[in-house]
Amino acid sequence: DEIKRDDPKNLPDGKIFRKDRVDIVSPAQKTIHQGVYPESAIIQMMDAALDVLNDKTIPYLIRVAIFHYFFGYIHPFYDGNGRMARFITSYLLALHLHPAIALQVSILIKKYRKRYYDLFSHTDADINRGDLTPIIIGTLKFIEQATLFTHHTLKHKYQTYQKAKETLTQTPSLSTKNKTTAAICDILLQAAIFSDIGVSV
């Protein structure tokens, strides 16, 4: 209902998806891609994309990368296709990796938007003749970058937490021998280090 109220002109008007044509334009208003048309072709290609996503003979991360590309290429809706593709990809990655890595992938894609769009352009180029290698390698690099960043961040925060916890246990004024007090102090410490907003009471 909220989507219907806020953006009624971009609602799907076909049986499942959009029924009319849609163009993807550059900031200079130049058409760089046309979404699949008509809706019957959209449905057919989405079914094919889902078949690839569920094909367990293909490594999982490659399936996710291919589906992400197919969704963007098909462009089943009038608007919000990129956001939906990132959401689906983040969800799929969270199932098999970790939610922190999945969210970081989405952040990186948004941060390096030109690099991301170039992956689609290179894959769509006539010279590649449908070769999905650029989008697969590019997506895997985003995942690798997100994984390394998340690992580095968590490692640094954990080391900070361990040092702070050691300092806390050596503070005479705190009754850390009391289990309840120690547990509360530990929760507050974790919130201060691992959360951007700390903790509220």
Q: What does each of the following model-derived ranges do?
A:
Residues 1-201:
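FIC/Doc superfamily catalytic core
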